[in-house]
Amino acid sequence: MITSRRAVARRGCAVFVSGLLGLLALAGPVSADSVSFGTPTATSTFGKGIVFSQSVSGASFKEADMVLTLPGDIGPSVVKIKNPGSSLTYTFDTSTGQIQPNTKVSARFQVVFADGTTQQGPETKVTYVDDRFHWQTKIGTFVTLHWYEGDAAFAQQALTMGENGISKSARFLGVTETAPIDFFVYADQQSFYDALGPGTRENVGGEANTVTRTLFALISPTDLGYARTVVPHELTHVVFDDGTTNPYHSPPRWLNEGLAVYLSEGFGSSDKSLVSQAAKSKTLMPLQALTGQFPTTADRFYLAYAESVSAVDYLIRKYGQAPFQKLVKTYSTGASDDEAFTAAFGIDTAAVNKGWLADNGITSSQTFGPQTAPAGPVPPGWTTSGGSQGGQSGQGSSGAGLLIAAVLALGGVVLLGVAAVTHTRDRDAQPRL
């Protein structure tokens, strides 16, 4: 599962207006008066909030603000401080789970003087941490592992899986990794879901937050078999995002998830069985249906993953692995799906879908969704060809004729009005000599 830059951008749009105001405030003049800011403090408590405090002295001011910036936001958000005095305090509420652990928050107070000018205090940075546990840490080349249950041998095995997963994905996709990735291992389901937030689906066992470069996984120290799949799977999402990220367009989810499954476990027998059964029962979803969020029902959810890796497997069997590096590089330029697939494979996404369906024995498909409505009944007294219909033909024809004449007359009036306005504008637009 992925928490992507696109997902965070939706929250960024929600604070666009306040962020714009914040930017304007940053660019504003500084008053002749000034204040002295004390040392800022920030205290983070998981599931409750982050409390920012700072003393201020000197000139009087009209109001005070908190300027906050979160990873992935399009700009800072500005929040008015209620009843500001010599000590400024603001609590960033995290009780609703809107941010995940390991999110780095930048903040600073600013005061607004009576003349509208502003003065900002020093910036403070704090990491929102899951402080419910005593975390232990192991540092690798790319991955920093955090865990609280299990011995050092368990942690080393999980770290090795992460390092190998990063290296394998980077080689396959042609991506050079340099920035570190934090990997948090949770031992029980409830704690894991609490960390990810209330929107987490019940069948998720791992999540990669590509904005904060953080991997969360539910791994019991006694279940390293599952870890061998989920760890490289989620880390592939990070590598894929590093290679394709751009300000304009995200690749389809089936491609992202399909690559993560393929590089972590291949196109396994269980996924093959799901796709085969769906093909026989004519319940396969086209790839166009898997570009965004996957279905929520369990059977369609797992089928979506199976179809995704099936499509990736089909492309690799037909075209080889090399075009995927071209695909990733093209996506990084902001190309559309059709542009990226055409550059890499020589075919657009419709052709990819058609070829994949044919590879699964499907040459025709039934279209669902909005359909053209059938023609309704002819009203009494009307005809479909302008002829008579019983004894009411004259009445129907005359009624239709009057309606048409009225419409034409109204159209003529509108055209005359437009012409008059256009003439007036043209006349007024004449240059003055």
Set out the residue ranges of the language-model regions.
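Acidic/His/Gly-enriched intrinsically disordered linker/tail segments
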Residues: 202-214, 219, 225-230, 242-395
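Glycan-association/targeting regions that enable binding to alpha-glucans and other polysaccharides
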Residues: 22, 30-134, 431
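Juxtacatalytic substrate-recognition/specificity segment
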Residues: 134-252, 269, 294, 298, ...
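Juxtamembrane/start-of-transmembrane alpha-helix segments at the extracytoplasmic/lumenal side
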Residues: 392-410
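C-terminal membrane-anchoring or membrane-association module
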Residues: 405-433
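N-terminal secretory signal peptides that target proteins for export/translocation
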Residues: 1-9
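Bacterial N-terminal signal peptides
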Residues: 15-25
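Soluble, non-membrane globular domain cores that form compact, hydrophobic packing
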Residues: 28-30, 106, 383-390, 417
